[in-house]
Amino acid sequence: MSTSLLTNLAAVAVILSKTDQLARVATFQSPESSADEREEALTDLLSANVRLAHKVAKQHVRNGLDFQDLLAQACEGIIHAASKFKLDSKASFTTYAKQWMRARCQEHVQANA
């Protein structure tokens, strides 16, 4: 994921309600959605959660690891969460995605320690 894309997402971060996030996840997961619809849904999810990704990445910066690499890993966690999230889950998408953001960052730290 490019640094400029992450910077642009942070600049235009939007707030999506739980219902709106679920709708974006449903669009992203739906085989009936076009590639453009899936891309737009994913962009909205990334934009709505990029500040949380920033926070998670910042918590893992140590030993000279590049913050941008960690931020990219956190965003990969959002993408993974969007593909695996169960729409009937009682947990919010953000809560679920945060687990995957942390996991991706921890894997990156371990691989590059």
Predicted feature locations:
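Alpha-helical promoter-recognition and RNA polymerase-docking modules of transcription initiation factors
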Residues: 2-113
